[in-house]
A protein has these predicted regions:
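Short secondary-structure junctions
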Residues: 25-31, 89-94
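Amphipathic alpha-helical segments
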Residues: 12-28
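Loop/turn position at the start of each blade in beta-propeller repeats
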Residues: 1, 64, 98-100
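N-terminal beta-strand motif that seeds the catalytic metal site of vicinal oxygen chelate
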Residues: 1-17, 66-73, 119-125
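Short hydrophobic/aromatic beta-strand element in the GNAT-like acyltransferase core
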Residues: 44, 70, 102-104
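Conserved short beta-strand elements that form part of the metal-binding/catalytic scaffold
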Residues: 27-61, 112-118
């Protein structure tokens, strides 16, 4: 099996989709779609609101290690600066190990975003 997408229930899907497309390199799979696809075209997120009476999860109060969306970054520090300027909040920045640079941020709605630069990929070649 191959992973297709991860679904995230948020209070304001349209705003999160717009921010993700503008700042994280996503694009909608089709106009008006809840699916946004990364620049590889191989992985996507479904950003939606369930429409139920219960509130969307409060991602800002969750530990970022419980759920986060991770991205490969060629320059973690530069991407942190760019995302913070776009409204993200920095929680953790670790760039002292040359084999692994990492940052945890939260988008403007509290959803955790991880940036990673690894010496060796976690994927099979």
């Amino acid at each position: 099996m191959k992973l297709e997408h991860v679904a995230i229930d948020v209070a304001d899907p349209e705003k999160l989709i717009a921010w993700g497309c503008e700042n994280l390199g996503f694009r909608r799979s089709a106009p008006g779609s809840a699916f946004i696809i990364d620049d590889s075209g191989m992985m996507g997120l479904e950003i939606y609101r369930t429409g139920e009476t219960s509130a969307a999860p409060d991602y800002a109060k969750m530990n970022a290690m419980t759920l986060h969306v991770a991205f490969v970054s060629e320059d973690v520090k530069a991407d942190v600066d760019r995302l913070v300027a776009a409204g993200a909040t920095l929680e953790t920045l670790k760039v002292d190990n040359p084999a692994f640079h990492m940052a945890i941020l939260r988008d403007p709605w509290g959803v955790p975003v991880q940036l990673c630069k690894r010496e060796h990929t976690i994927f099979f070649k």
